[in-house]
Amino acid sequence: ATHNCYGVDLNPTAVDLAKVSMWLNIIYKHSKTPWFNLRLSSGNSLIGARLQVFKEADLKSKRGRGVENYLDRVPERINLINGRHDDEIYHFFIPDVGMAGFDKDKVIKGLLPDEVKTIKDWRKPFTEEFTYAQIRTLKRLSNKVDELLTSHLNNRERLLKATDDNIPIWPNSNKTEGLPIKAKELQEKDLYRATSAYRKLKLMMDYWCSLWFWPIEKAGDLPT
């Protein structure tokens, strides 16, 4: 069960209850307490960045009559095994016209006209086509994401193996002692430490997500 169940919930208590429920369903005499921390966690399963990319050509195109660019495209999902191509840029480095979309709401436009104007003035240059220099920077950033992603996946795989509880099944009766819960939690803490690959990736993705929910009263602080 610890190898095949995955889940996420906004409520940490619901996550803990799920762990207890799973444990009660697989418990047997002399069994160890299963450890689900790397597979059941608290978070938002509906909002977030994904491993999807835009093509370099879409970023260069100037949007106009009969011409589409990245603002009209849906980013393509990449396969972790095959990886990302050199002409592809991760979508969480790319702006979207839906970010800070308060100017689409008639009520808010009537209540906060100055802030809405600030957002509209910000969005126009923010969503322009990219220059060649900017695309080179985006490529370097995407390459760095590849490195961080590989590092995190390797670290997680090592932790999964280190925290695995082997169950002896006849005729193979070799019994190995697994790590105690406290030791597993310490290794998990190291995986998510402030300077880890995971935290660096999360910071980039959280920044992109924040632009969709930017508080209108701070419209003047929107990044350029």
PLM region descriptions:
Residues 1-224:
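SAM-dependent methyltransferase catalytic region
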